[in-house]
């Protein structure tokens, strides 16, 4: 194994604001994303803010998936971190982006735990 973990930091823009503000939808989306990527879900915690926004985490045996949503801006900040090489964090990240109807997606992929972090250029996908 070349790395102890893989981390995808995802910026999602022009998302469906109703989905970004629906705690039940986001929780299901994140649990499904974890399961689709082959992860084992351990704990789930989500919080709905007033007047809008959701933050949450799905703890998986292999690490975690998190979100902070800003429906008023059509924006979500998503992290998917997986230890080892059995789970592909890109599968979960893509599923989440599609589930939130993101029109613009920016990913930064990091390898973790093997020395200094090398931060690559962000990869931007626009689906307008």
From Swiss-Prot:
Matches recorded under SUPFAM superfamilies: S-adenosylmethionine decarboxylase
CC cofactor: pyruvate
Family assignment from sequence similarity: Belongs to the prokaryotic AdoMetDC family. Type 1 subfamily.
Protein name (record): S-adenosylmethionine decarboxylase proenzyme
An example Gene Ontology biological process: spermidine biosynthetic process
Oligomeric and partner information: Heterotetramer of two alpha and two beta chains arranged as a dimer of alpha/beta heterodimers.
Pathway stated in the Swiss-Prot or TrEMBL entry: Amine and polyamine biosynthesis; S-adenosylmethioninamine biosynthesis; S-adenosylmethioninamine from S-adenosyl-L-methionine: step 1/1
GO terms for MF: adenosylmethionine decarboxylase activity
Enzyme Commission identifier(s): 4.1.1.50
Domain of life: Bacteria
Organism: Exiguobacterium sp. (strain ATCC BAA-1283 / AT1b)
Co-factor binding details: Binds 1 pyruvoyl group covalently per subunit.
InterPro entries: AdoMetDC_C, AdoMetDC_fam_prok, AdoMetDC_N, S-AdoMet_deCO2ase_core, S-AdoMet_deCOase_pro-enz
UniProt keyword list: Autocatalytic cleavage, Decarboxylase, Lyase, Polyamine biosynthesis, Pyruvate, S-adenosyl-L-methionine, Schiff base, Spermidine biosynthesis, Zymogen
Active site residues per record: 63 (schiff-base intermediate with substrate), 68 (proton acceptor), 83 (proton donor)
GO cellular component terms, A-Z: cytosol
Annotated site residues (Cleavage (non-hydrolytic)) in this chain: 62-63
């Amino acid at each position: 194994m070349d790395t102890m973990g893989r981390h995808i930091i995802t910026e999602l823009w022009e998302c469906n604001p109703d989905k970004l503000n629906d705690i039940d939808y986001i929780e299901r989306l994140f649990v499904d994303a974890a399961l689709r990527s082959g992860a084992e879900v351990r704990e789930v915690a989500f919080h709905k803010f007033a007047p809008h926004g959701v933050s949450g985490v799905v703890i998986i045996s292999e690490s975690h998936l998190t979100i902070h949503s800003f429906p008023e801006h059509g924006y979500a900040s998503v992290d998917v971190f997986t230890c080892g090489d059995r789970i592909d964090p890109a599968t979960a990240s893509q599923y989440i982006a599609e589930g939130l109807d993101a029109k613009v997606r920016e990913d930064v992929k990091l390898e973790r735990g093997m020395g200094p972090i090398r931060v690559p250029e962000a990869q931007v996908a626009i689906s307008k």
